[in-house]
Structures are given as C-alpha cells and as structure tokens.
Amino acid sequence: MSGKPAARQGDMTQYGGSIVQGSAGVRIGAPTGVACSVCPGGVTSGHPVNPLLGAKVLPGETDIALPGPLPFILSRTYSSYRTKTPAPVGSLGPGWKMPADIRLQLRDNTLILSDNGGRSLYFEHLFPGEDGYSRSESLWLVRGGVAKLDEGHRLAALWQALPEELRLSPHRYLATNSPQGPWWLLGWCERVPEADEVLPAPLPPYRVLTGLVDRFGRTQTFHREAAGEFSGEITGVTDGAWRHFRLVLTTQAQRAEEARQQAISGGTEPSAFPDTLPGYTEYGRDNGIRLSAVWLTHDPEYPENLPAAPLVRYGWTPRGELAVVYDRSGKQVRSFTYDDKYRGRMVAHRHTGRPEIRYRYDSDGRVTEQLNPAGLSYTYQYEKDRITITDSLDRREVLHTQGEAGLKRVVKKEHADGSVTQSQFDAVGRLRAQTDAAGRTTEYSPDVVTGLITRITTPDGRASAFYYNHHNQLTSATGPDGLELRREYDELGRLIQETAPDGDITRYRYDNPHSDLPCATEDATGSRKTMTWSRYGQLLSFTDCSGYVTRYDHDRFGQMTAVHREEGLSQYRAYDSRGQLIAVKDTQGHETRYEYNIAGDLTAVIAPDGSRNGTQYDAWGKAVRTTQGGLTRSMEYDAAGRVIRLTSENGSHTTFRYDVLDRLIQETGFDGRTQRYHHDLTGKLIRSEDEGLVTHWHYDEADRLTHRTVKGETAERWQYDERGWLTDISHISEGHRVAVHYRYDEKGRLTGERQTVHHPQTEALLWQHETRHAYNAQGLANRCIPDSLPAVEWLTYGSGYLAGMKLGDTPLVEYTRDRLHRETLRSFGRYELTTAYTPAGQLQSQHLNSLLSDRDYTWNDNGELIRISSPRQTRSYSYSTTGRLTGVHTTAANLDIRIPYATDPAGNRLPDPELHPDSTLSMWPDNRIARDAHYLYRYDRHGRLTEKTDLIPEGVIRTDDERTHRYHYDSQHRLVHYTRTQYEEPLVESRYLYDPLGRRVAKRVWRRERDLTGWMSLSRKPQVTWYGWDGDRLTTIQNDRTRIQTIYQPGSFTPLIRVETATGELAKTQRRSLADALQQSGGEDGGSVVFPPVLVQMLDRLESEILADRVSEESRRWLASCGLTVEQMQNQMDPVYTPARKIHLYHCDHRGLPLALISKEGTTEWCAEYDEWGNLLNEENPHQLQQLIRLPGQQYDEESGLYYNRHRYYDPLQGRYITQDPIGLKGGWNFYQYPLNPVTNTDPLGLEVFPRPFPLPIPWPKSPAQQQADDNAAKALTKWWNDTASQRIFDSLILNNPGLALDITMIASRGNVADTGITDRVNDIINDRFWSDGKKPDRCDVLQELIDCGDISAKDAKSTQKAWNCRHSRQSNDKKR
C-alpha cells in the first residue's frame, strides 16, 4: 500500500486511458513512510533510554537559538540505535544528528528519508508532482515538477509559497509535517566538475537539506561548499532574518595536528591521535569532517556589534566522537564518553556540575544498565514483545509491545504496584483507546487521513469533539458540556478570530503579508491594542486600549534588556556571557543581583542593601539548603529525587513517605502530627487519616467528587447537572443541613450562588442568601445583584478598567486613573481621595480633603515600607534581614513609643527581651506556643488550640479567678464551639455553622445575664447572626436588629461600600415570587396548586423581565398562548418595597484595613486606629455603627476576641492562627503563621501570603378582585402546561433560551402533576408523626402505606407517584419489565 492519492494523474485505466484528475484526499495501498524504528524520543526511561529500541538517546539539546522568522536552531540529537540503511555520519560524529542532517536516498523503487533522529523512513518511488504521506509520522514527501498541486490538496496553498523554479524542478524533493509549513528543501550541492568530467555534472543518488521555506515565502538557506576538502558540507547558514552564521569544519588530520601542537606547547607527550578515521561505522559512512565552531558573522540589526567569540564550540575524541560542548561564554557545558570497541556508542555523559551517568550494553547493542551514582539506576531486560525495567529501589515496570519497526507500540504496561494499563492503536500506530488501571476506557478517534484527534470519549460516555479546516487547523472544539471554542483563519493560515466558550470574541489584525505576528488585537469589549515587532519577531512596543505605550529593548541574543512604561517607570536587566540574568535595576537605581554555580543553578540573590539570600543544591540541582538572614532551612531527598525530610529554622523535622508510584502516603509534621493518604488504582485519593480521623472520598465515573464520609458518616455531597457543572454542595453542620446552590447561563458562566440553612428537626428554611451575577454584551461581569439590594454595576472603560460604580440607578463612586491605569482620584459625594506613586511605582501618598486622614509612605531600597506619616502621628518600621517586622516606633504630639516584636527562627512569637529580660525561651520547636506573657495554651493532636487560660505570674497568690477559653472543632478542623469560663462558671458560649465550602454561615452566642430569680447564668435564647457570601468574600451580616452588606473593590478583599438596613425595614421587602403567588392561590376553591419546576423557572424569568421593564417577545408570545398578558401578570406580583438604607464608603489603608466610614455628605461617622497585627487601639463611634472588618478577609468576633479569616481563626494578640494551615506546606513551613511582615503583606483567605433568626415574609394584603385574578392566572398556566406537554420541548420560548434547564422527565410524563388532595393528606400524616415520635417519615413511604391500606386507590395515586419520582412506582415498573 502506497499512501498515495487513490486516483493519480497519469495512472492508467482499465481501457488504457490515463486519469487526468485525481483525488488528493483519499489514499490507497499499504502504508508508506513507515520508519525503521519508533521515535527515539518517544518512550523514555531515566536519563534517558528508549527501552523499545534498547537505545541510549538524547532527544534534543539546543546549542544555538536566536529569535526570528525561520531561525537557525542548532540542536543535537543522539541515539545509539543503528538503522540498516543509514545516511552518512554527520558533522557531529557517529550517533549524533542535527536538523541539517536530513537526507534522502534515491534508490530504484524506494526513497529512504533519513531524519534527524537517526531513523530511516521508507517511501515508494514518486513521479514528478506526486506525493507520499506517512500516516504514522504525519509527514509529506513531495517531488517537484508541477507548478500547482490539485486544488483539493492540503498542501496546495503551501506549495504556491515556493519559488517557481523549485516547484517546477523534478529533481527536487520537499518534505513537511504540516500544511502550514515550513518546507524542507531536499536538493543537491552544486559542485565544480572535475577537468575530465562530462558537463554538466550528473546529479547524485541522494538529496540533502539545502534550505527551508515557510508559507510566507521566507527562507533559510544552508550554504554547502562546491569544491575542496569540504565539498558538499554546510559551511554557512542564512536565517529568515538575513543573519549569517559561519560553520567552522575540520578534518581528522587537522584535529590531529592541532592536538600535537597543543601537546608540544604544553610540554606533554602527544596522545595517540590518528590522521585518518575508518571510512565506515555502525552509523554510516564517515568522511571524518566535524563541526568545530559556529560564528555569527552578519547581523542586520547589530552590524558593528558582533560577538567576539563563537556561539558554540565542540571538542572531539581522537576517534572523531563528540567529546565536549562549550557555550558562547567558552565554558564547558557537556561531556561524553564512548565505548572503546564500538565507535559512537555512548557509555557515559554529564552536564557540567552534575554527576556522570553511565550505560552498559549487551552483545546486540541494547542498553542493559543505566548507572546513576546520585540517584536512581535502572536495568533493562529484553524478551519477545516484552521489556522489563527495574530501578535501584527494586521497583519493576513491564512494557508489552505489538508491531514492528516504526509501528511498534506499548499496548500494555504493568506498573510497580501491580496495576495494569492498556492501549489500543490503529494500523498506522495511532492511539485509539486507553484503559486505566481500574478498567475504564477512554476512546480516541483520529482522522483517517491526518491522524488529528476528532473525538475523545471518556469512560462515563461524555465526549469532546474537534473540527479542523483543510489545512489541519483547529476550527472548533466542543467540550462534554456542549460549550464550543471556535477559530477562524485568513488565507495565509493566520488566526484572525477566536470565540471562547463563554462567547468572548478576540480578533487579530495583520499589516505585513509576510509575517504571522499580529499588529493589533481587539477583545470582546471592542478595545484595540497594537503591537510593533522587530525583524526578529521581538515585541518592541505595546499600545493599550487608551493609547498608552510600553516599549521593550533587547540585546543581540534576543534577551529583554529594558521595559519602559508610562509615567516614567523603567526596569533594566543585565546578563552574563552565558545569558544568565545577573541584575535587575529600577528607575531609581535600586539593583538586585543574582549569582549562579557552574551548573547554572541560582545560588544567591543580593538585595539592593547588600543582604544576601543563598541556596545550596545537591548533585542534581535540587535545593538542599536555603539561608536568609542567617536562618537556614534544609531539604533531604531519596534516590528517586523525592523530598523525604524538611528541617525548619528551629531544627525540627517534617518527614514524608511514598508508595512505589511516587505518591505521598504519609506526612509527619514538625509537631509530630501524622497524616496518611491512600489512593485507588488510578491515583485518586480515596482515604485519608489524620491522627485517627478517617475520611473516605467517593467519585463518579467522570472522576468528579460526589461525597465524602468522615468517621463513617456522610459529610459533603456534590451534585452536577447533565453538562457536568457543579450545581449543589450540601452537608450537615451542627445538625443543620447547609447547602450551596449554583446557577449558570448557557455559556457556563456563574449567574447565581445561594446558601441555605435548614432546621435540624423541621427542615424549615432558617436562612437563605443569594448573590446573582450578570454580564454585559462584551462578556464582562459588570453587574452583581446582592441579596435584597439593588444591582451593583461597575462602570468600566477600555478592556475593563474600573471607572465608577453604581448602586441601582445611583452613581456612588468615581475613579480617575493615570496612564498606567492606576487609581489617582476616588470620589464619593464630597469625599475625595488622591493617590500618588513613587518613581519606582510604589504608593507614595494618599491625601483626603480631610487633612487629618492624609498618609505619606516611605520605602527603603529593598522595597520595604519603613514609614507612614500622617498629621496625627508617624509610624516607623524596622525589619530583620529576613524581612520580618521587628519593631514599630510611633511618635505623636504627646507620644514616643517603640514596640518590639521578637520571634524564634521559625517565626513563632517570643517574649519581648526588653520587657522580659529573664526569659530563657529561645524557640518553640513544634511551632506550638505553650505560653506567653498573658496566657497558657494547650493543643490537641491535630495541632488545634483547645484551651487558653490566664497566666498567673509567679509570686501571685492563686484565687481561681483566671479565665479559661475552650475551643472545640468539627472533623474539618473548623471551630464550632467556644466557651469562656471563670470560677468554673460560663461567661459566654458560642456555636458556629459552616457551609460545605467551610464558610461560616451562622453564629449563636449565649452571654451571661441575670435571670428572673436574680442568679447569673447564660441566656436561654442566643443572639443569632447570619452570614452571606459571594465566593470567598463575606458580603452580608444579619442579626435581629440590622443587616450590614459590604461591596468590595473588584478582584480584592478591600471593602468599598457599606450598606446598612434595619431588620424591620428588611422585613417589609419580603415578597412572594410570582410563581409562589400563583401557586398559593391558584387551586380549586382558592386552594394551592403545585407547578412543575420548569414552569416555576419560566415564571421567575418572566418576573425578572417585568421588574427590569424588559419583557422579551418570546415571553409575550408564551403568555398569549396561555390567554394572558404582561399587564395581567404584573398585577399578580407583590409590590416592591424600597427600604431605608444607610450608605457609607470605607476609607482603608494600603492593605485594605478600614480606617473610617464616610457618609455621602463627606463626614466621618466612624474611625479607628489599629496596630500592625490588626488589634484595635482606639475607636471613635458617635453613631454606634457596627464595623467588624479588620485586616483583609477578617471579621471580628466580640465573644472570643478572634478574627474569623475564611478558612481559619486569627488571634491578633499573638499575630497567628489558632489552627494549622488547611493547605499544609503550600502555605508556608510554619502552619500557624500570619505574614511576618503584616505592614504590607496580608492573608485574606487564611491560607497563604498575599503580597496584600431570619424573619418570615409578611404577605401583602390583596383585594378580592386581585385574588380572583390570581386564581384565574394560575388555572390558565396549569391548563397550558398540561395541554402543551408533548410539544413543549419544541416551543419557541425554549428553543430561544438554551440556558433554561428542561426537566426532560417531567416533559416525558405528559403532565403528571401531584394531586393536591393526596399531597395534603400525606403532609398531615408526616406532621402528626413527626411531633409524636420525633422521626420524620418519607412521603413516598406514607403514600404507599395509604395505598396498601386501601385509603387511596393506586390508580388515583399514580400521577402523584410519578410526579414525585416515587421509588415504589419505579420498582413496580421494573417488575413489569
């Protein structure tokens, strides 16, 4: 089989006539272009060996790569594999290849293409203008001789990019692996004929690479010598940017003479260095010519500034083998050793500064052993269709193969843990399916011709589809959720438009027909950004949507040397001769320097003030010790390179253990806390143990988490819709069912998040909070509808830069920005905040039209904030060499005080040495602070603070009046119960509820008070506070008196607007939805009716349209089909009440800590002062406003004195958390630590450093006429629903609203609605039984009981059972089937 077009021009027909038109897309015959072996860089092991070939391989090491179109990239590839039809040895010696070594051998009926991996690809003979396509290698080989290819050919456009003389020459061959190119030109070297030869000289029986041509007609040319000792060899290259490189070649005799001269000049005995080499090796014929160096000899951009040294140099063994490589700085970077017996067979290699890796071979030339003196070693055992790999940890992997030569594939893999994975391939070696260790299969559908994946089907049956144009470019991709990515291209194959799955469109513009670099882009907002490029494809300037320009400078090697931004900001970078970054300097001249070892590892960072941070590495370049400011951390690794031990600054250890597949199975922390992990066959975590606390993790077929059990009880549950989007998460918190519900639009964007809390016994809804999001036509999330508030709309310009904010229709905040889009002025009524920046871009000042609140900032050379000055006081900060805050010096009119902060090496707070000079405490090895100047602390085995007791100073008589704080946690280490006692009597008690995401949703506090008998005891009724969230930001706090809602600055945890509404006012806003109103009064005799969920959704949509005064035509047509009008429906809606609200602006410091609340009149109605750790120092609150926000992400709890910080609780007195970090080491080595420089750093999530009772609704009274209208509307809608069930899926309303989730089951049931009479009877029984025995029966069980007793006929209950999706009905149907 040839792989040629099914019908080719020139083929003869049965009756003798030739075919004049052929099909370029359909191919016939046996595969052509099949390689002699698999790709050397395909399946590899260790450092690296290809076990399928048994070959030592180095897939690619790049020595030269300057930027530009069609750049000259000199990369080396090594393989000890030996093909039976080798090309001659190249200029890098036996076993080595570079891209220029591609060669085509012309034989009688076969073409043999030798690639740069040392392989041979076999093609059938080609006639002029004919092509062969290797489906296994996705490679075309085309013979010249025609001006045009068939119009339907995938390479037709690329063919026309070639010069006409190349296209028309039948003696030239061209190869490419993409319809976008480039072409590899295979020609011959024009040599000078000998004197006795007949002219012209005959063409050789091979073709060599003479150049490249891309689809824009740009060329790279390889210059080969026409005569002399280097005839036919490449001695020069001109790249696509017209840079010229000179390749210095040497013969074996020249190298031998050079070796002798070096020995003589060095006074040593010359080593044996023969003048000639054998003419043949296992890797092909060898002429002994080698590449010695490569020079850059012409650079159009830097004609007078050429490098004074070669870009790369090579050294050679006496046998002509590549021995060493020197980079452009002259430093040796690589060395190689070869077998004494077999020339070119590599037995060892090393990177400079790294250990030497050695190899052993069997008699067939296959690698049997890989020896690593500082890591894993491997042995290889070869059998028929089976390779066994065993490492030095005695872990074994077995590869089972099928196929031969280039079609050899691994079809089964036995892993070290005994698990097995399998793969299936088609006839040309393309992957068709993979079966994981659990037996689940993922299927792949490659295009028959191109091999491009057109479909992926996962084990759960969900599929992704991919579509391509005729040039093999992706035009569309549809995910399992049905969302689609689309791309469009111009005639040159350049991307001109991309439509993201969410509908955002990005467009690309080009002004140069010979370049693939865009000159402009246009985003979904319509904002246009322009770019200019150098001839080498480097970005020179970027102009944003406002016309502001950023400029870039580069050196001759393509490295960025400077960035110049608007407002005078610049950054400069310097590099050493090896191209390593050695210095970065800002506009003010502050310079950070970098140092490296011989292997290129970064060993030191020197700050502008000269302080030094150092890192030491092991033999393989893994950091083993870091030192900063005299403090050291160290890391240890096993032979597999896995971290096995960490040693903190305190000398404490954390240790790790792994399974045979390198998965973490045990972690023992600095404090001895041990956590264990168990994985299933596919690597998913299925069980975790935390000091006896056992958690099981459960997944569905799509590997999505479905539920978790802790100590045998169900914890969280996750639910997904048919598109795979998360819709609900629920769990039980302190007996309450707490859930989070999500809604999306048809583009997959989040449109709503609702938190609900239900009563433990009655399941009554206690709390509900919803935040909705809306997107403008450009896709920006510019509208947020907080719970019970008007919409918050963010006003933007350009690509989304913030310009202002509105609440409902009322503009509240305006912003002015500079040429870097930084805020310079913020206006809120009469309030104006002016912000200025230093030349280095740091915050310089924030000035108000109220002078007392002005703040000026001073920074040191290291970028640390060292002073904040205001009219009232000045605070100066001092830091350790590690960047930790060590002291605050505050000066004011009548104040001069310095507060020191002392920590142990790991960052744990220590007693102040000035106040406690007798303290001998120097560190807390386990990071658990057991005592300080005021308290004693106790922890449980999970590292959670469980008790804090007043410290009785020595010498003080104990009176048992110390206060004790006790903390209790749930299985997720969340604080759920707090008590404070004195004299063994409770002073305060609180309990906390959380949603499944760990966000606190409720707080109940009991305080000590005097009862009717005069005794002091805890109150019987708690003070209840509810919390509502928008993502990770706490937006709502509500108690029995007031609701406070916070609007944050977009993308931050800095509060912007505070809205307070009295609970009494809030109650007046409670109204039924249109659907509820119709259901409650739409039944027979004024009773209620139950609408199907889809109808409720449609009514909700209609109601939102009516409230926004934007009723769609689809909704109007739907109402008309029901015999209703918009006006009628509007009359059924409860009126909307607008409550009285207090609105304030938060005036915050540079971190986001509120300093003042400003009214719209510009008056300060609350202000406060804090220390650097967030402790309140003083407060002015004449209006009795409740302001509980502290440092970003923190909420003050009065009962405990702690700050709730999203994932944990923060103790401001200690400046640290009371529990360990949920994300472990990712958040830092000290699991309790808050940022040790709180002056500028924050932790709003309680995870890691950022370098910053609900009242029941009151029904609105209605007139009898309105009540009658409600009844009629409800009946009309119910009738419409039942009458149109069979056609509803095709209804224009649904078709035009793809985001509306249809209940297909309900549609199929054709109007199975629960009988209201039966429903009422069931509910009565449930309520009676609940109150009598405390257990709530299932409604399906009650209904079946009524049927069994004969109280209700099965026929009458059938509709209700179906509507409830009752399991008894399902079981009955199953029996019938």
UniProtKB/Swiss-Prot annotation:
InterPro entries attached here? DUF6531, Ntox34, RHS, Rhs_assc_core, RHS_domain, RHS_repeat, T6SS_VgrG/RHS, YD
Q: Gene name on record?
A: rhsA
Which UniProt key words apply to this protein?
Repeat
Q: Where is this region: 28 X approximate tandem repeats?
A: 330-1186
Repeat (sequence) positions are 330-352, 353-374, 375-417, 418-438, 439-460, 461-481, 482-502, 503-525, 526-546, 547-567, 568-588, 589-609, 610-629, 630-650, 651-671, 672-691, 692-711, 712-734, 735-758, 808-828, 829-850, 851-871, 872-894, 895-930, 931-959, 960-984, 985-1019, 1162-1186
Chain positions covered by the region annotation Disordered: 1356-1377
Taxonomic superkingdom: Bacteria
Q: What is this protein called?
A: Protein RhsA
